[in-house]
Amino acid sequence: MPRRTDLNHVLVIGSGPIVIGQACEFDYAGTQACRVLRAEGLQVSLVNSNPATIMTDPEFADHTYVEPITPAFVERVIVQQAERGNRIDALLATLGGQTALNTAVALYENGVLERYGVELIGADFEAIQRGEDRQRFKDLVAKVGGESARSKVCFTMDEVRETVEDLGLPVVVRPSFTMGGLGSGMAHSDEEVGRMAGAGLVASPSANVLIEESVYGWKEFELELMRDGHDSVVVVCSIENVDPMGVHTGDSVTVAPAMTLTDWEYQRMRDLGIAILREVGVDTGGCNIQFAINPHDGRLIVIEMNPRVSRSSALASKATGFPIAKIAVKLAVGYTLDEILNDITKETPACFEPALDYVVVKAPRFAFEKFPGADPTLTTTMKSVGEAMSLGRNFVEALGKVMRSLETGRFGFWTAPDPQGDVDQVLLRLKTPTEGRLYDVELALRLGASTEKVAQVSGIDPWFVAQIGELVKLRDELVAAPVLDAELLRRAKHNGLSDRQITALRPELLGEDGVRSLRKRLGIHPVYKTVDTCAAEFEAKTPYHYSSYELDPAAETEVVPQTEKPKVLILGSGPNRIGQGIEFDYSCVHAAITLSHNGFETVMVNCNPETVSTDYDTADRLYFEPLTFEDVLEVFYAEEQSAAGGAGVAGVIVQLGGQTPLGLAQRLADAGVPIVGTSPEAIDLAEDRGAFGDVLTAAGLPAPKYGTATTFAQARRIAAEIGYPVLVRPSYVLGGRGMEIVYDEETLKDYITRATALSHEHPVLVDRFLEDAVEIDVDALCDGTEVYIGGVMEHIEEAGIHSGDSACALPPVTLGRSDLEKVRQATEAIARGIGVVGLLNVQYALKEDVLYVLEANPRASRTVPFVSKATAIPLAKACARIMLGSSISQLRFEGMLAASGDGGNVASHAPIAVKEAVLPFNRLRRADGAAIDSLLGPEMKSTGEVMGIDHDFGRAFAKSQTAAYGSLPTQGTVFVSVANRDKRLLVFPVKRLADLGFHVIATEGTAEMLRRKGIPCDEVRKHFEPPKAGRPALSAVDAIRAGDVDMVINTPYGNSGPRIDGYEIRSAAVSVNIPCVTTVQGASAAVQGIEAGIRGDIGVRSLQELHSAIGAGIAADNEVQ
């Protein structure tokens, strides 16, 4: 069946910012979708608010709209294209997660799609409703002979209470049409039911929740299926959760293929899955179905279905080599499975189900260390911020690799001191699912607990527990063996142990280098296998590799050189985490693409299954491997050996993947690996405060006074000399980890006690904190001689809030020409002083006309994608070319960089782009269910970002807020409670809100000040202030929780008593999902955004149009000059 000829123009909706529950797997899916559609000759319009994605690069669509993903904005795109005579024929929403699906449903229900003749493809409206609506799906499962958990859909709290009485406690609360289990949880008491169901009714777009019987402790499985228009169905992959029901699948360690299913259970699950897929009506695409099995009686029930490409779809794609998103798009435009060729084998059609002769393990990455108040218990609400995946020939080999891929400071079992406690305490901990529970499984077994006991208390299947038990036996052998011989060492490596783990057990081997030397002498090295989708039945034509240590010494590697071109290894960024996310993958992908087009064979090394970089056709060759020194070095050796007289490895790129590869640079260089671009010595120079200070002194550049301390006494002396407040942090961190503003000696002592434990090898840095300064971010390129300013960003929040959490504007809004000239001169001096070859990010603070240098990072920054989208300059591609020998003047001549000028010169009429951070406060809760504090500071907390771009700042800021958190209010009530130091500065923005018609309420002190300034204001009492006669009865928190407040402005009070009241105010705002502004500058920006919203003239423009306008502006400026 050929492609549909009635489709000419398809609209693709992305998933928006990276949030917990919806990450960069949808950039991977969306990028594939755009590639396929354009390859089929279709015109593509794309809507996605996330500038850090590959899919929003202008070359992936004909019309790229970096706009909020809301029904209103998507409708504007549809209308704009129709008015231009370029009507959109179809909407593909099954590749953008829950955000895209919910937006498509709203557009259908509002009549927009019918009005403009737009067809839903991939899954129609009825299929989405049947798959997503809890009650309809439950009825459908029963119709095909399946069973669901006993449950009822409830629309009111009265219905909830009746259902709980019928089912009995505990129950599971699941809101409809939400992602990542948002709002769901296990309720063990009536109080918990009330809290969770109340929150769930708010979280659900359809305002209903499913109350179902608890199946906590059951085994959980998933199937990935695809169906075409001829009713052919393939089961792509089965996935088993190591953690039992009760832990969200995104937070569980998962294994593919499923390990513990009987043949009867698998066949029953498969038959049910196919029947459900057909009954739901997903006839041109893929879906994910989750099942649970009672381990005691074998009862099998269907949990839920995603009638779209999901997080698990990305995992299944990378696990099998079967490109689910790509094939889903081909099915959506009319092809059938038998007409689509397998990209890996180039012979078999897509109707051949994948077969695996290896095991895949995925493990989640958490960020609880960033949120000390958050409850670390794993529940049905997803909390992980990223994940890693590994492949091995057996389960324990893959498990060992994935554990060291997570970069948590532990490199697998036995690489960190065991927590204190006896076996009973460890078993008690295992009853509550937490981040490190597999370590407790191993420890319990080592302390003498039986496999059965550990399985019983943890709910983990005995097979998985027994596999870890085999590792415990192997550990005992390694410790007891008089000599580490070839057979034992080979077995250790075959079972996934790293050199680091082995040296922890055998310290006489003198570290990793000693273990590696011993392996080499004994001829023990990894072989590299190929992911081929067919268990070696057909030859793989696509080089997608993983390592394994085979027991057979004669086993051979399957890596073969693709060309005689020189090879470049690109080290990715590993699992997403706060501080190191999709922005770095963006730069790695750009490097692979541009170097492949410029005479190099590109080799990607990464372990993140969500990313575009680990798509098998991004680089010329892919290694799905941990980003550790040992694993990267072995890949380098394999590539060198495979050259066989041809071109070897020209170099390894470490400066694009964030801190992870940077941390490997010096050791790799010492091992003889060529590092291209900025040298490891220059990287270290930028991190060494003393050496970097010398660079600044030579250039005559001021920096905040600072000192380096390794003891509290030293830190106290430095702080006394500098003057409080001071900024303290450990060296060599990303995302501001461990960074705090300290106001007094007592707090400093507390910090030093914690921070030195955080970083043993590097000292603590103590800086003067510049209050009320304007922070500036600069991304620049340097070829060793010439410097090219990519972009200058002005932070909206003041210095002291981490740059990754602060909104910023490009071009700067308040900086003058003289300020920009200071920035240029300082950046050029720093780039040359360090010796940068490639990208450089510098952060400045401007205070009283003095430009202070805060820090310089000779690497790609998280703002590179944003700057590239805002300026139309591909900084990451240019960086890759520069690192491999091109000059800036050459790139100007080729047209990759502007022929004259750069991002330090703002073109006339340039649009304003605003980047806003997206924070996970609605996901992470305290143990009592209360929201964690939304206050920002020097430690980064955001998971993702959005971009708003328009003609002026107000419109651009309004778009950024809509994309990140929902529209700013244009009427209603604003609550104001601010610290004394901020009251004078907040008078103007609050007066403007009152003039716009807002009702202002405030606590006593703030209300008195506002009334003195002529601003009408009603008073409410503080949360912890008892009601008094003649005083307001209503507290601020009561008003917020009652829904009587539309926006909160609350700046922190420092360490004084009112700080607790501020927490209650901010957490209440998070709970009811209203804007909560915590800085003066943020309030001023919000007012400008609200004014733009009231005017109502916010339109949409594609990046292609905006970039054309930028080019025209630059040309006009050049003519004037």
From Swiss-Prot:
Residues 966-1113 form the MGS-like domain. The keyword ATP-binding applies. Pathway: Amino-acid biosynthesis; L-arginine biosynthesis; carbamoyl phosphate from bicarbonate: step 1/1; Pyrimidine metabolism; UMP biosynthesis via de novo pathway; (S)-dihydroorotate from bicarbonate: step 1/3. This is Carbamoyl phosphate synthase large chain. Mn(2+) 2 binds at residues 304, 306. Mn(2+) 3 binds at residues 843, 855. Large subunit of the glutamine-dependent carbamoyl phosphate synthetase (CPSase). CPSase catalyzes the formation of carbamoyl phosphate from the ammonia moiety of glutamine, carbonate, and phosphate donated by ATP, constituting the first step of 2 biosynthetic pathways, one leading to arginine and/or urea and the other to pyrimidine nucleotides. SMART domains: CPSase_L_D3, MGS. The lineage of its organism: Bacteria, Bacillati, Actinomycetota, Actinomycetes, Mycobacteriales. Signal peptide: none annotated. GO terms for molecular function: ATP binding; carbamoyl-phosphate synthase (ammonia) activity; carbamoyl-phosphate synthase (glutamine-hydrolyzing) activity; metal ion binding. Residues 560-965 are annotated as: Carbamoyl phosphate synthetic domain. Residues 408-559 are annotated as: Oligomerization domain. Mn(2+) 1 binds at residues 290, 304. Mg(2+) 1 binds at residues 290, 304. Keywords: Amino-acid biosynthesis, Arginine biosynthesis, ATP-binding, Ligase, Magnesium, Manganese, Metal-binding, Nucleotide-binding, Pyrimidine biosynthesis, Repeat. Residues 966-1121 are annotated as: Allosteric domain. Its cofactor is Mg(2+); Mn(2+). The large subunit is composed of 2 ATP-grasp domains that are involved in binding the 2 ATP molecules needed for carbamoyl phosphate synthesis. The N-terminal ATP-grasp domain (referred to as the carboxyphosphate synthetic component) catalyzes the ATP-dependent phosphorylation of hydrogencarbonate to carboxyphosphate and the subsequent nucleophilic attack by ammonia to form a carbamate intermediate. It holds the Pfam family CPSase_L_D3. Mg(2+) 4 binds at residues 855, 857. Mn(2+) 4 binds at residues 855, 857. Composed of two chains; the small (or glutamine) chain promotes the hydrolysis of glutamine to ammonia, which is used by the large (or ammonia) chain to synthesize carbamoyl phosphate. Tetramer of heterodimers (alpha,beta)4. Mg(2+) 3 binds at residues 843, 855. GO terms for biological process: 'de novo' UMP biosynthetic process; glutamine metabolic process; L-arginine biosynthetic process. Binds 4 Mg(2+) or Mn(2+) ions per subunit.
